[in-house]
Amino acid sequence: MENNKSGTILVVEDEPGVRDVAVQMLEFAGFDVIEAVDAASGLQRFKENPQIDLVFTDVIMPGGTSGIEMSKEILVQNPHILILLATGYLDKAEALIDKAAHSSNIAGVAKPYDINIIPDLISSMISSASAEPL
């Protein structure tokens, strides 16, 4: 894993330990990282930070709003935002991923994910999006 990545990532994860690892992994790789502890704070951080390139979110979170519901709201605000869904229940994310199958801006990863792969996947998503015409 190289530490020469660039971009701003919003990490939305309710489990403090998982969130800390994700943030450290992405910062070490060179990304700027904004944290949120649930979908409500994720939506707020997204509205406050228009420079966000990608939302890396857990799918299942307490508090009523799931990562999928939050992602749908974010996509209404910015249809070009990149979203990486992380879940131990990948079938829960399949509906949104299937719906966006013709779009390169949504992907899913199974938990536990490999911390050596995620930064490269995110960098690849950002590079691909910046190469595509809007």
Residue ranges and their predicted role:
Residues 16-34, 106, 125:
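Two-component/phosphorelay signaling modules centered on CheY-like receiver
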Residues 86-88:
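Hydrophobic/aromatic residues positioned on beta-strands within the core alpha/beta folds
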Residues 109-111:
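A Lys-centered signature of the CheY-like receiver
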